[in-house]
């Protein structure tokens, strides 16, 4: 897992969900651990798309439940 991408995703998640950066780990679940609701999740996906200049299709977004899932998806898209 790319440390650079992980740090950037953690920063975005912390900002979008208004949680302390120290609470955001690679295995943190957006809804169960970080308190995100469905709207938060949509906004988070949009922020990740913008930050990494990628497109995350709805089907893929549904499979992204943790910070690690997001990092893995971004790594695959960025090649």
Curated annotation (Swiss-Prot):
SUPFAM superfamilies: ACP-like. InterPro entries: ACP, ACP-like_sf, PP-bd_ACP, Ppantetheine_attach_site. Its main location: cytoplasm. Keywords: Cytoplasm, Fatty acid biosynthesis, Fatty acid metabolism, Lipid biosynthesis, Lipid metabolism, Phosphopantetheine, Phosphoprotein. GO terms for biological process: lipid A biosynthetic process. The modification O-(pantetheine 4'-phosphoryl)serine is found at residue 38. Residues 3-78 form the Carrier domain. Pathway: Lipid metabolism; fatty acid biosynthesis. 4'-phosphopantetheine is transferred from CoA to a specific serine of apo-ACP by AcpS. This modification is essential for activity because fatty acids are bound in thioester linkage to the sulfhydryl of the prosthetic group. Signal peptide: none annotated. One of its GO terms (cellular component) is cytosol. GO terms for molecular function: acyl binding; acyl carrier activity. It is found in: Cytoplasm. Carrier of the growing fatty acid chain in fatty acid biosynthesis. Belongs to the acyl carrier protein (ACP) family. HAMAP family: Acyl_carrier. This is Acyl carrier protein.
């Amino acid at each position: 897992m790319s440390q650079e991408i992980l740090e950037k995703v953690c920063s975005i998640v912390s900002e979008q969900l208004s949680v302390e950066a120290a609470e955001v780990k690679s295995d943190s679940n957006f809804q169960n651990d970080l308190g995100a609701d469905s709207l938060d999740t949509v906004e988070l996906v949009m922020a990740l798309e913008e930050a990494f200049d990628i497109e995350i299709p709805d089907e893929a977004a549904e499979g992204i439940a943790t910070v690690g899932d997001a990092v893995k998806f971004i790594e695959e898209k960025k090649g």
